[in-house]
Amino acid sequence: MPAGADVAISSPVSVDPVGATLGEGPVWVADEATLWFVDIKARRLHSFRPDDGVARSWAAPSQPGWILPVSGGGMLVGLQNGLHLFDPKTGGFELVHETEVHLPGNRLNDAMVDRHGTLWFGSMDDAEETPSGRLYRFRDGQLHDTGVAPVVITNGPSLAPDGRTLYHTCLLYTSDAADE
């Protein structure tokens, strides 16, 4: 039986019509039974609990590229200027680490956490005109530039099952399908 063959497919249902401008990065937090996601351009964080239908939204101080749970509670958010802890109870943000202060036109875009707890994330030119993005990893309070650059847009970072290869889509190279 193919993977996913036992999953029921149904028509999409709008459970929380937030009207996102650029909704991205859905992440399910099992401990809370809550779906989290960001609206990058509207500078909003959203959560939705399907069990009771509770939907919440918070304003972010700058564009959020992603949101991920932190062990022990709270969320880590990649905002335009760096990594921030977010407390859903207070709506407060606390800067953990600045990123790319020398590139004010850049923002963080997508992220994932590996099985060792290392955060992998990318940056990008918010205007999508210059390949000024980079790929980073963050662990134990230390930010490391992976040397993967230039990056236009990091999307969908994912690790191979052996944990040795990181894949991500970077929209750096294009081709014209009409070229022969």
Feature annotation, model-predicted:
Residues 2-19:
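A short helix->beta-strand "capping" segment at the edge of beta-propeller domains
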Residues 12-16, 53-58, 94-100, 143-148:
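A short beta-strand motif characteristic of beta-propeller blades
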Residues 18-32, 60-75, 79, 102-118, ...:
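Beta-rich, blade/repeat-based domains predominating
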Residues 37, 77, 121-122, 168:
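Residue position within the beta-strands of beta-propeller blades
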Residues 40-41, 127-132, 171-172:
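Short, solvent-exposed loop/turn segments at conserved positions within beta-propeller repeat blades
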Residues 44-46, 82, 134-136:
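A short loop-to-beta-strand structural motif that recurs across blades of beta-propeller domains
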Residues 49-52, 88-91, 138-141:
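Short loop/turn segments that connect beta-strands within beta-propeller blades
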